[in-house]
């Protein structure tokens, strides 16, 4: 019984640790990371534990499978001030 309980607890902890997300990672001002080439986005996204590319139509880095703690851009919470 104790072993089953421990297994459930560790499984829930592991699920929380391994959860990943996708999106536009933001800089310290809340703006999307500007790009033109895929290489720079690949390096940025690898630093966040995922992979990515430059979404050329929007000139912004898109990352897949990045950690949940990475702040990502959202229209609802947009704090970016255009320069």
UniProtKB/Swiss-Prot annotation:
InterPro entries: LCN-type_CS_alpha_beta_dom, Scorpion_toxin-like_sf, Scorpion_toxinL, Scorpion_toxinL/defensin. Expressed by the venom gland. Disulfide bonds join 31-80, 35-54, 41-61, 45-63. GO terms for molecular function: sodium channel inhibitor activity; toxin activity. GO terms for cellular component: extracellular region. It is found in: Secreted. The keyword Transmembrane helix does not apply. Residues 1-19 form the signal peptide. Residues 83 form a propeptide. Residues 21-81 form the LCN-type CS-alpha/beta domain. It comes from the Eukaryota. Keywords: Disulfide bond, Ion channel impairing toxin, Neurotoxin, Secreted, Signal, Toxin, Voltage-gated sodium channel impairing toxin. The keyword Nuclease does not apply. Has the structural arrangement of an alpha-helix connected to antiparallel beta-sheets by disulfide bonds (CS-alpha/beta). Belongs to the long (4 C-C) scorpion toxin superfamily. Sodium channel inhibitor family. Beta subfamily. This toxin increases the peak sodium current, slows down the inactivation of sodium channels (Nav), and prolongs the action potential of dorsal root ganglion neurons, which indicates that it behaves as a classical alpha-toxin. It binds to mammal brain and insect sodium channels, but with a different manner. This peptide may bind to a distinct receptor site on mammal brain sodium channels, which is unconnected with that for BmKAS (a beta-toxin), BmKIT2 (a beta-toxin) or BmK I (an alpha toxin). This is Toxin BmKBT. It comes from Olivierus martensii (Manchurian scorpion).
